[in-house]
């Protein structure tokens, strides 16, 4: 089977990762020890994508948990799902990266990276046909961003033919832990543009807004934010974990969503999102799900899709839904809002339906959009980066770890290039595309036509 190896790096990555494993164990009928207690054959049919069956009959996640300090990993070990994971797959240092990207990427992280790669190799050897890796991390800290991107590039070297998907939490000014987040994020994006195949951008600010405005939680805790992320991750990976035709592995997902290799940063959305109080007062319908999942307020990245255009979209509906109704609704959305979809990629909205609903819900929908408006997110980080870098503020934290200012300049210009590429394709239209092709036809061919 086509296996996926999961890596959690840093505090944020491990917390999201733990929430993800808890969610999918519940969906696949596994208890906290990895024993199958479900009653639906569909739950077992593609279990080996994420789980390894041990001789004892228990299912063990193909997960490697990495951090430069022991705190978060200890919390995962002692949590209710702590017994799921293979004890050798917890790898942690004692020092911490202190929120500095350079420590995670060049010094502290580089010392730990070989022992992580040993575990990754061992996991890969236990696979029949490895399709790729998924990594959860944040871009604002030191370990998830610095060591996370180091791991991505090392795994890229060693497994060049496999896919690399990342769930990356982008820092936002409203929910900020440290002042140097823009540096860490820009240096990370510089790496992700080159080394990741698909990056799902999740943004703390957007998560807070959803919790406060839609779920009516006045003071959302990290656990509640992580639950949101884990429902999205569970939705995004539905087609990988259950039998189906569309986007059934990471590569097919990328083929449908990535028109140009550098533009692989996706926005994700999820429905139904309802506050606890009003849950019992509404029934969820397909039109309502479609409406809500395309709603800008429910995007998990703080950029507004109405300010850009969708290059491609993938939607996953789960539960007892009629395929025809789903297709009709999606078609309606496209025809009513045709100006928000680029016209030079035909059939750029793909829809998949899976009959197994998430736990405790009748139906749900997950949305992945490759929208040019994601540039807002990079612009925001870029502006903060430039403001500090112009004055060389806090640079000594990085140069003292052996980094060069040149790297900062390169990262900045790579991110600016990314923004202008998105802008270029936002403005492109069919006529321009045809003109470009016309330029490429040699004159004698043109004359023959």
UniProtKB/Swiss-Prot annotation:
Cytoplasm recorded as keyword: yes
Coiled coil (UniProt feature): none
Record key words, sorted: Cytoplasm, Cytoskeleton, GTP-binding, Magnesium, Metal-binding, Microtubule, Nucleotide-binding
Family annotation (Pfam families): Tubulin (PF00091), Tubulin_C (PF03953)
Residue numbers binding GTP: 11, 69, 138, 142-144, 204, 226
CDD domains referenced in this protein's UniProt entry, alphabetically: beta_tubulin
Cellular component terms (Gene Ontology): cytoplasm; microtubule; tubulin complex
Residues that, per the record, bind Mg(2+): 69
Molecular function terms, GO-annotated: GTP binding; GTPase activity; metal ion binding; structural constituent of cytoskeleton
Subcellular location: Cytoplasm, Cytoskeleton
PROSITE patterns hit by this protein: TUBULIN (PS00227), TUBULIN_B_AUTOREG (PS00228)
Keyword match Magnesium: yes
Gene Ontology annotations of biological process type: cytoplasmic microtubule organization; mitotic spindle assembly; mitotic spindle elongation; positive regulation of intracellular protein transport
Cofactor: Mg(2+)
Main location: cytoplasm
Quaternary structure (record): Dimer of alpha and beta chains. A typical microtubule is a hollow water-filled tube with an outer diameter of 25 nm and an inner diameter of 15 nM. Alpha-beta heterodimers associate head-to-tail to form protofilaments running lengthwise along the microtubule wall with the beta-tubulin subunit facing the microtubule plus end conferring a structural polarity. Microtubules usually have 13 protofilaments but different protofilament numbers can be found in some organisms and specialized cells.
Function of the protein: Tubulin is the major constituent of microtubules, a cylinder consisting of laterally associated linear protofilaments composed of alpha- and beta-tubulin heterodimers. Microtubules grow by the addition of GTP-tubulin dimers to the microtubule end, where a stabilizing cap forms. Below the cap, tubulin dimers are in GDP-bound state, owing to GTPase activity of alpha-tubulin.
Entry similarity comment: Belongs to the tubulin family.
Protein name: Tubulin beta chain
Higher taxonomy: Eukaryota, Fungi, Dikarya, Ascomycota, Saccharomycotina
């Amino acid at each position: 089977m086509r296996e996926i190896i999961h890596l959690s790096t840093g505090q944020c990555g491990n917390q999201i990762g733990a929430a993800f494993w808890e969610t999918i164990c519940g969906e696949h009928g596994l208890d906290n020890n990895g024993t199958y207690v479900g009653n639906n054959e569909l739950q077992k049919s593609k279990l080996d994508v994420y789980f390894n069956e041990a001789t004892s009959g228990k299912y063990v996640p193909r997960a490697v948990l990495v951090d430069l300090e022991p705190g978060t990993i200890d919390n995962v070990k002692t949590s209710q799902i702590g017994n799921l994971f293979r004890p050798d797959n917890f790898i942690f240092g004692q020092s911490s990266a202190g929120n500095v990207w350079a420590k995670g990427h060049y010094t502290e992280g580089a010392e730990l990276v070989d022992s992580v790669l040993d575990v990754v190799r061992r996991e890969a050897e236990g696979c029949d046909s490895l399709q790729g890796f998924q990594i959860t991390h944040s871009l604002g800290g030191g370990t998830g961003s610095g060591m996370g991107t180091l791991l991505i590039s090392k795994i890229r070297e060693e497994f060049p033919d496999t896919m690399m998907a990342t769930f990356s939490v982008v820092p936002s000014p409203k929910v900020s832990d440290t002042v140097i987040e823009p540096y860490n994020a820009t240096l990370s994006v510089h790496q992700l543009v080159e080394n990741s195949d698909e990056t799902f951008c999740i943004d703390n600010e957007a998560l807070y807004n959803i919790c406060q405005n839609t779920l009516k939680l006045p003071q959302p805790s990290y656990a509640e934010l992580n639950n949101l992320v884990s429902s999205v991750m569970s939705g995004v990976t539905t087609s990988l974990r259950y039998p189906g035709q569309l986007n059934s592995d990471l590569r097919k997902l990328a083929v449908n969503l990535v028109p140009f290799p550098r533009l692989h940063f996706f926005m994700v959305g999820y429905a139904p999102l309802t506050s606890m109080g009003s849950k019992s007062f509404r029934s969820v319908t397909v039109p309502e799900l479609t409406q809500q999942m395309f709603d800008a307020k429910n995007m998990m990245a703080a950029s507004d899709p109405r300010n850009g255009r969708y290059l491609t979209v993938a939607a996953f509906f789960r539960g007892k839904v009629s395929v025809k109704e789903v297709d009709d609704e999606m078609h309606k959305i496209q025809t009513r809002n045709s100006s928000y979809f680029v016209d030079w990629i035909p059939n750029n909205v793909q829809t998949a339906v899976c009959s197994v609903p998430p736990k405790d819900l009748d139906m749900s929908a997950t949305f992945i959009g490759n929208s040019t408006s994601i540039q807002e997110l990079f612009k925001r980080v870029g502006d903060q980066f430039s403001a500090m870098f112009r004055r060389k503020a806090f640079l000594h934290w990085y140069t003292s770890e052996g980094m060069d200012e040149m790297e900062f300049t390169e990262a900045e210009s790579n991110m600016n290039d990314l923004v202008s590429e998105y802008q270029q394709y936002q403005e492109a239209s069919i006529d321009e595309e045809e003109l470009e092709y016309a330029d490429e036809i040699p004159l004698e061919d043109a004359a023959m036509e």
